[in-house]
Amino acid sequence: MAAPPAPQPPSLLGYHRVLSPLAGIRVSPLCLGTMHFGGQWTRAMGDVTKETAFALLDRFYEAGGNFIDTANFYQGEGSEKWLGEWVASRGNRDELVLATKYTMSYRLTGPEKIKSNFQGSHSKSLRLSVEASLAKLRTDYIDLLYVHMWDFSTSVEEVMQSLHHLVAAGKVLNIGISDAPAWVVAKCNEYARFHGLTRFCVYQGRWACSYRDFEREILPMCQSEGLALAPWGALGRGQYKSAEEFQQEGTRNMGPQEEKHRLMGAKLTEVGERKGVAAAAIALAYLLHKSPYVFPVIGCRTVEQLEANITSLGVELSDEEIYEIEDTIPFDVGFPMAFLFESPQQKYRSDMTTRHIWQVTCNARIESVPKPRPIEPKQGYKQMDRK
């Protein structure tokens, strides 16, 4: 006798997805970032009290979210400590997918006199950081561990061997990489592939409709290697506002508003008004439409912001609307993609294939298989029938 279907999720956040072709773990379509949590960086990032942080974590969890991101470095280690305290108090560790990172100088305020090995991607830094993260998160395993950045001093061999040993020991389940060149990631995964080691399954980096340099090399590399994408900065780091709003509210003491962000904010607001949602929902929906296996990292400071972000999962954008957003500010994809795909009649788009290369099609009509499409947004709630 077949089992009945699972109950309807409390929100669109509860329709979970496979993380990537290389990692079968199931995660919510949005990842809650906790860089605001910890109480140490209030001058740069604004004040989020522990009470507010726990309320955000509670609402994310109640809405069906299970994918949460932190790092050893955030808030002078305060982010991991608060997250670990919340998880322990709620008793829901195994329901969650916790992601953290190593490489950054996480002991900046520690009592140690010599701190040279409390940073970097090498084996000692990895060991020290992971043991500390496990203690702060109050757990005995990490679902996803990122190399936080490429330090350009540790070899591919050392990084991949050391990470694999942690996976084999059961302390880490999956590995990812952040803020690294595409060629480095490809080289790491090639080494792992040919030596029977664990491969990177997700890439985290800056990507937004006003930060499209990610699309030059990183996006196609991830699509080719089977990596998921966890973009940070999807909301323009708080700059998608009018000049008046920015002047009144500011943005975490991170400098003046850039003109490209003001223009993009106006366009996102315009598209959002047509669809009855906030500009932030359009910014997230844009990324969710660009490629499969995209899990934006959302950094919220209020429950209201979180609720607005969740609505992005029900927003449908046409190709024309995506192009409208992209054409708001210039984007130079650079050589060789511009040379191959652009012409006076054609702008580069990230979904282009062989049939869009004019040197290929100038003497023959060529058809090609489209690039894989992402999961379509859900319009309200849908029954998930089992066959």
Swiss-Prot record:
Induction: The genes forming the sterigmatocystin biosynthesis cluster are co-regulated and induced on oatmeal porridge or the fungal isolates were grown either on oatmeal porridge or in YEC medium (0.2% yeast extract, 5.0% corn steep liquor). Expression is positively regulated by the cluster-specific transcription factor aflR that binds the palindromic sequence 5'-TCG(N5)CGA-3'found in the promoter. The keyword Nucleotide-binding does not apply. The active site is at Y74 (proton donor). It holds the Pfam family Aldo_ket_red. The gene is stcV. This is Norsolorinic acid reductase stcV. Its EC number is 1.1.1.-. Norsolorinic acid reductase; part of the gene cluster that mediates the biosynthesis of sterigmatocystin (ST), a polyketide-derived furanocoumarin which is part of the most toxic and carcinogenic compounds among the known mycotoxins. The first step in the biosynthesis of sterigmatocystin is the production of hexanoate by the fatty acid synthase (FAS) units stcJ and stcK. The polyketide backbone is assembled by the non-reducing polyketide synthase stcA by condensation of the starter hexanoyl-CoA and 7 malonyl-CoA extender units followed by cyclization and release of norsolorinic acid. It comes from the Eukaryota. It is an enzyme of class 1 (oxidoreductase). GO terms for biological process: sterigmatocystin biosynthetic process. Pathway: Mycotoxin biosynthesis; sterigmatocystin biosynthesis.
